[in-house]
Structure formats: structure tokens, C-alpha cells
Curated annotation (Swiss-Prot):
Its EC number is 3.1.3.71. It is an enzyme of class 3 (hydrolase). Keywords: Hydrolase, Magnesium. Belongs to the ComB family. The keyword Magnesium applies. One of its GO terms (molecular function) is sulfopyruvate decarboxylase activity. This is Probable 2-phosphosulfolactate phosphatase. HAMAP family: ComB. The gene is comB.
């Protein structure tokens, strides 16, 4: 079965979990690994992140969209350029995305974004029990995460859909332009734009820049690549 859940407050269980935080955690994870980072370690708190500082490690993330004091990078994927992060381990803490990862009980967890949409779909074709976990925003529904979930469901072309997956697929089918839909109607996108992150929204709504599938292994996202 394929299903979609939004901003779970309690643990969720499945065989293959796909964590989605379009704006911006999973987009940043995909970008960082695609640009040469050796791994991304998601953590819940700022304090936990700072404790992991050592040579070869970058402390990164945001609270309320802004880079915390003492951090090397924020949560803008545009900051994660090859010359800054290649060969480095990223410790990432964010308001939404890294929090929801802690609630997933799954045999495997992968990170999805529009940036690696086709690679994620290809990876999932061989999987049976799939749960698309939308991070949401501060525990609430996020339009952009649900829209990406719908895009994944649509491309998988499966019949064994839960109600959440059917709703996400129908929403995706109703949208003519995903980027414009997000920019015009997503409250989180509007807030990021008001804070000066319009380029982030543009970047995070770009499809298939990367052929990579970040997979969580022993608490670290590492890269899976497809030809």
C-alpha cells in the first residue's frame, strides 16, 4: 500500500518511509549530498547540533527560517555549494523536517523533494509498503509537501492507495503549475518570500536537478545514485 500522512504528532510505522519537507529541509539534504557532502546527520535540537562540532563537520540549520547563532550554514539549499561542503559531514537541525524524522519507525527512510522527484519514484517502484510523511509547518498542514506527495503517488501508478494518497494525487492532478501553486497559495512559501528567501522557493520547486536518493543509515543520510 501507498499512503500519505501529514505532520504526525506520534510515531508512524511502515516499511519504507519517504520524508518530505519541500521548504526546506529535504531539499537541503538532497542538495548537500548531491554537491559532495559525505553525509547529513539530522538532529532535533540546536544544543545537540552544537555538541557535534569537530573537524570536518558543519553545523547547519534554522529556527523560524533563520540561521541560529554559532551555526556555519542556515537551511537555504543555495548555501550548500560544492566549494563549501564537499567532503564534509553536515549536522542539520530544522524547525520541521528533522523533527518529524524522529517520529518515523521504518526499515528505511529516504528524503524526497522536487529536486530529486524522478529518482525517488524510480527507487520506490520496487517497494510495497510506502508511507509518504509530510513534515508540515509547526505541526500543521503544508500545501507544498502534500503537492509533492501527490506527484510521487501519480508517477507510481499504483492501485493500492490509502485515502491520504488518493487525496494527494487528486490535488496534484488539479494543479497546472506546481511552482506557481506553491508561490501563490502556500503560507510557508509566502512567509519565506517575505523574509527574503524567494530564490529558495524558486529553487526548491525545480524538478529533477539531481538523480540522488538520500537514505538514512545509522542516523546519517547518505547518497544513493541512479544512472
Amino acid at each position: 500500500m501507498v499512503d500519505v500522512v501529514m505532520a504526525p504528532c506520534s510515531p508512524v510505522e511502515c516499511r519504507t518511509a519517504v520524508v518530505i519537507d519541500v521548504l526546506r529541509a529535504t531539499s537541503t539534504i538532497v542538495t548537500a549530498l548531491s554537491n559532495g557532502a559525505s553525509g547529513v546527520i539530522p538532529v532535533k535540537t540546536i544544543e545537540e547540533a552544537l555538541k557535534k562540532r569537530k573537524e570536518g563537520v558543519l553545523i547547519c540549520g534554522e529556527r523560524n527560517a533563520q540561521k541560529p547563532k554559532g551555526f556555519d550554514l542556515g537551511n537555504s539549499p543555495l548555501e550548500y555549494r560544492k566549494e563549501k561542503i564537499s567532503g564534509k559531514t553536515i549536522v542539520l537541525t530544522t524547525t520541521n523536517g528533522t523533527q518529524v524524522i524522529e517520529r518515523i519507525r521504518s526499515e528505511e527512510i529516504i528524503a524526497a523533494s522536487f529536486l530529486n522527484l524522478s529518482a525517488v519514484v524510480e527507487y520506490l517502484k520496487s517497494k510495497e509498503d510506502i508511507l509518504l510523511v509530510c513534515a508540515g509547518t509547526n505541526g500543521r498542514f503544508s500545501l507544498e509537501d502534500f503537492l509533492l506527495a501527490g506527484a510521487v503517488v501519480k508517477r507510481l501508478k499504483r492501485n493500492d492507495l490509502g485515502d491520504g494518497a488518493r487525496a494527494a494525487e487528486r490535488y496534484f492532478e488539479s494543479v497546472e503549475n506546481t511552482r506557481e501553486e506553491i508561490k501563490k497559495h502556500s503560507s510557508h512559501a509566502k512567509r519565506l518570500i517575505s523574509l527574503g528567501f524567494e530564490k529558495d522557493v524558486e529553487f526548491c520547486t525545480t524538478e529533477d536537478l539531481f538523480k540522488t536518493v538520500p537514505t538514512l543509515v545509522n542516523g546519517v543520510f547518505i547518497l544513493k545514485e541512479f544512472p
